[in-house]
Amino acid sequence: AVYEAVNSGLLVITGGPGTGKTMIQRVILDIYRSKHPDAKIVCCAPTGRAARRMEQSTGMPATTIHKALGLLAGDDGSYCEAEMLEADLVLVDEVSMMDVYLAGHLFRSIPRGCQLVLIGDADQLPSVGPGAVLSEIIACGEVPVVRLDKIFRQSYGSRIAANAKLIRHGNLSLEYGEDFQFFESADLAVSANLIEELYLQETARFGVDNVALLSPYRQKTETGIN
């Protein structure tokens, strides 16, 4: 992925959580800066939060795509024409969050000779706006794509990673074991007691700071977040 990014005019790098996308960004930037110390590099992402995370993880200044392109919203909600980027390398993270309009502005603003690297997870939900940009770029077959499929965030043989992949492909024949368990209960009160018991058990084992308790319900119910 790093070799292709440094030596290609356009590249897509896609992979799920924990496959090394962030590490690859850092390595791409380190190698590119060592080869081209005077190069102008633009790091950007569709949202402010994603841009801040990109800046923290790479150590390079990062901004939103809108700000990088000088896109200002008018009173009617439309945007002015984007500015042409002054860059030798443009690195875009979280591309799956980019809609077709923002992608159009970005691609028209890439100067001739500039290298463009698009990074994201094609299996994430598409953008709120129209167009599944990342998935459609990959599907067109005209753009070089590097797929990261080895997961480093979980241990080798993790059922969490294996089951996430099965679910993404609509397969519910999941694998169960110590690191992936399922408890079925039709009674909310029984479920709440079971959750409390499991939480106390796991916090005693791993410590409070290392155990997360999540609920799909915001409402104040037996299994809500209250």
Mark where each language-model region is:
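N-terminal pre-P-loop "Q-motif" helix
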Residues: 1-7
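Conserved helicase motor core of P-loop NTPases
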Residues: 4, 123-226
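Pre-Walker A (Motif I) flank of P-loop NTPase domains
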Residues: 7-13
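The conserved Walker
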Residues: 17, 95
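Conserved lysine of the Walker
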Residues: 21
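Hydrophobic positions on the alpha1 helix immediately C-terminal to the Walker A/P-loop
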Residues: 24, 28
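Inter-Walker segment of RecA-like/P-loop motor cores
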Residues: 40-89
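Walker B catalytic acidic pair
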Residues: 93-94, 120
